């Protein structure tokens, strides 16, 4: 629900200090901690722990933060804190934060009965369905002949032997940069994820088998190995309970906040010019 502006996010970033924070850089004698950087980029990281990021990513974020800090230092040197535009933007940010606090106070008063959550699930079970999925690898090549040659190389192989050889050929021959280094691995996907000719061929296979003819798509010619499959199934209530509750809570919040706004409007003296 929180929708802080960039200005507000910049203002509040780094307010909370962690006693275990580690210094990652100094800027003109001022220490920069990993906690400051982590909190500043929290909206972008979306729950990822800054400390667990690869070193090159951490360095890039630290550098961005340092640039932001240097701009801030330069702005202060120019005494822009007294600039009318700064004052205007600061007041606007404060107002936005105050409205968010007001709305969150109302949201926190709303409680959704557990029976109502279960009833919603029972009435909408058709919406809570896991689609059928397959796990597959593929080898993408430019010509039909190349695909046929690969199929011939794989002919007669089964189980681990087939899987190992398929991965080897994918790394050697596939022109799909997104999967070749993983041995052609595509992971799990449903029927809406891939182009139709590919999906139709993958779903038609038995687990542990490959396509016996090349599969043509707009990308080229594919050889597909179906590794595993999952049938369509009902998502359990416990898996979606929190999401349903949050959704119902937000719908109730919209009604409450709209009514509150209407009541305030009705009680105010408004003159349109």
Curated annotation (Swiss-Prot):
Q: According to the lineage, what is the superkingdom?
A: Bacteria
Catalytic EC class: isomerase
Q: Which reaction does it catalyse?
A: [protein]-peptidylproline (omega=180) = [protein]-peptidylproline (omega=0)
Enzyme Commission number, as recorded: 5.2.1.8
Give me the disulphide-bonded residues: none
What the entry lists under PROSITE patterns is as follows: PPIC_PPIASE_1, PPIC_PPIASE_2
Which portions of this protein are annotated as coiled-coil regions?
none
Q: Where is the PpiC domain?
A: 131-228
State whether keyword Signal applies.
yes
Q: Does the keyword Ribonucleoprotein apply?
A: no
Q: Which UniProt keywords apply?
A: Isomerase, Rotamase, Signal
Which GO terms fall under molecular function for this chain's record?
peptidyl-prolyl cis-trans isomerase activity
Question: Which Pfam families would you find in this protein's record?
Answer: Rotamase_3
Q: Which residues form the signal peptide?
A: 1-21
Name the record gives this protein: Putative peptidyl-prolyl cis-trans isomerase Cbf2
Q: Which organism is it from?
A: Campylobacter jejuni subsp. jejuni serotype O:2 (strain ATCC 700819 / NCTC 11168)
* Gene coding for it: cbf2
């Amino acid at each position: 629900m929180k929708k802080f502006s960039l200005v507000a996010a910049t203002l509040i970033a780094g307010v909370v200090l962690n006693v275990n924070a580690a210094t990652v850089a100094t800027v003109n004698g001022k220490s920069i901690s990993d906690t400051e950087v982590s909190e500043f980029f929290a909206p972008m990281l979306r729950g990822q722990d800054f400390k667990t990021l690869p070193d090159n990513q951490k360095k890039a974020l630290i550098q961005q933060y340092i640039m932001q800090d240097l701009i801030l230092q330069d702005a202060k040197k120019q005494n822009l804190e007294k600039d009318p535009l700064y004052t205007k933007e600061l007041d606007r940010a404060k107002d936005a934060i105050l409205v968010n606090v007001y709305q969150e106070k109302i949201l926190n008063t709303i409680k959704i009965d557990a029976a109502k959550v279960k009833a919603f699930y029972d009435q909408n079970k058709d919406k809570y369905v896991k689609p059928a999925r397959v796990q597959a690898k593929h080898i993408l090549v430019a010509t039909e002949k190349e695909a046929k040659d690969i199929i011939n190389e794989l002919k007669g192989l089964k189980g681990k032997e087939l899987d190992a050889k398929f991965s080897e050929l994918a790394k050697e021959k596939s022109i799909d940069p997104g999967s070749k280094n993983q041995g052609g691995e595509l992971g799990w996907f449903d029927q809406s994820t891939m182009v139709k000719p590919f999906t139709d061929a993958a779903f038609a296979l038995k687990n542990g088998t490959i396509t016996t003819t090349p599969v043509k798509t707009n990308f080229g010619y594919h050889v597909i190995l179906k590794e595993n499959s999952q049938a369509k199934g009902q998502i359990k209530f416990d898996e979606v309970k929190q999401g349903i509750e949050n959704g119902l809570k937000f719908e109730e919040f919209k009604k409450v906040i709209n009514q509150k706004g209407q009541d305030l409007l009705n009680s105010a003296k408004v003159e349109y010019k």
